[in-house]
Amino acid sequence: MSHALPALIKMHITKDIGYGLLLGIIPGVWFKYQIGQSIQKREDFYAAYDKRN
């Protein structure tokens, strides 16, 4: 007779790891996108500034 407890623990650990990955990846992707936008805006600003001067 096998125990259901190890399967239950494995399921909870897998679920916790999945939630952790989601909660870590989503802010990371958003942060990278925001940094990319910031760099692009800065490059565009300095390109326009160089054209004026």
Swiss-Prot record:
Q: What is its EC number?
A: 7.1.1.9
Q: Name one GO molecular function term.
A: cytochrome-c oxidase activity
**UniProt feature coiled coil, ranges:** none
User: Highest taxon of the source?
Assistant: Eukaryota
According to the record, the signal peptide region is none
Where found, per UniProt?
Answer: Mitochondrion inner membrane
Q: How would you summarize the oligomeric state and partners of this protein?
A: Slime mold cytochrome c oxidase consists of at least seven different polypeptides species, subunits I, II, III, IV, V, VI, and VIIe/s in order of MW.
Q: What does this protein do, in the record's words?
A: This protein is one of the nuclear-coded polypeptide chains of cytochrome c oxidase, the terminal oxidase in mitochondrial electron transport.
Please identify the protein, giving its name as recorded: Cytochrome c oxidase subunit 7e
